[in-house]
Regions:
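Conserved inter-motif catalytic segment of the P-loop NTP-binding fold
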Residues: 86-169
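A generic local structural motif
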Residues: 37-41, 78-82, 141-145, 178-181, ...
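Alpha-helical scaffold elements adjacent to nucleotide-binding pockets in ATP/GTP-utilizing enzyme cores
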Residues: 67-68, 103-111, 142, 146, ...
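Conserved catalytic network of the ASCE P-loop NTPase/AAA+ motor domain
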Residues: 45, 84-88, 119-121, 148-150, ...
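Phosphate-binding/switch region of NTP-binding enzymes
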Residues: 52-53, 58, 63, 172-235
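C-terminal regions of RecA-like/P-loop NTPase motor modules
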Residues: 1-16, 149-152, 226-235
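The Walker A/P-loop phosphate-binding site
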Residues: 7-110
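Conserved, well-folded catalytic cores of nucleic-acid-processing
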Residues: 71, 75-76, 111-114, 164-167, ...
């Protein structure tokens, strides 16, 4: 399948292929996107789509996505998250764009403990990448390559999306990143769940990327510290 990017102008032959690929027929049978992530009985994620967790700084967004990853890894209910990935979609790619390897290792161990798996043994279906040291453009390319070359991939966790951009308020950069999410999820039939901070003074996700995320994501989960007990976060 030809890659659809904004970097080159497609030839007429390529455009003809894209039109054929995008055509919707009234007689074809198109299956509904399979539900793969749920909170209790509410669907929050399907294959071919992406979702997000948003919240203020220190609201335990990473812990929240750790629970999602643990449920997908174990097939069990973890903190009310349930997962139903097909057998050929059991691989998880967890990408952290902010933290170094030591912190990422702690997150990895937490996921394994939540999944009730040993935290001193390499998990078969979970790959974690720390992309802190790379430039935004390189991070995006690394993720694209990892998604394209990981067999049996079903779930990609990206903590966080902001670090794919040089300017969080750039409309062109934001559109490019969200377009990549739509392309990857559709072409590979995976689910992507990402993380973004909220503004300090309101409930909106930060920057133009937050606006695009709100407009295009299948589900937005808001994570916030409990007003009665600061040690607890609620979704």
């Amino acid at each position: 399948m030809m890659e659809k990017t904004d970097e080159t102008i497609p030839s007429r032959e390529e455009l003809a292929v894209y039109i054929e690929e995008a055509a919707v027929s009234v007689t074809n049978n198109y299956e509904e996107a399979p539900a793969v992530l749920m909170v209790d009985d509410a669907v929050i994620g399907t294959l071919g789509n992406f979702s997000a967790s948003i919240g203020k700084a220190k609201s335990k967004k990473t812990f929240n996505v750790s629970a999602i990853a643990a449920s997908a890894l174990s097939g069990r209910t973890v903190l009310r998250y349930r997962s139903m990935f097909p057998e050929n979609k059991r691989k998880i790619l967890y990408i952290d764009t902010e933290q170094g390897r030591h912190h990422c290792q702690q997150v990895l161990k937490r996921i394994l403990r939540l999944a009730e798996m040993p935290d001193d043994k390499v998990p078969e279906n979970l790959i974690m990448l720390s992309l802190r040291k790379f430039a935004p453009r390189v991070r995006l390319l690394i993720v694209e390559e990892a998604i394209g070359t990981t067999p049996d991939l079903g779930l990609v966790i990206i903590d966080g999306i902001r670090d794919f951009l040089y300017d969080i308020n750039s409309s062109s950069e934001s559109t490019e990143v969200i377009s990549k999410f739509m392309q990857w999820t559709d072409d590979k039939q995976i689910h992507i769940h990402t993380v973004l901070h909220q503004n300090k003074n309101d409930e909106h996700a930060r920057g133009h990327i937050g606006t695009e995320l709100n407009n295009k994501a299948e589900t937005i989960l808001q994570v916030e510290v409990d007003k009665e007990d600061k040690a607890i976060s609620v979704v």
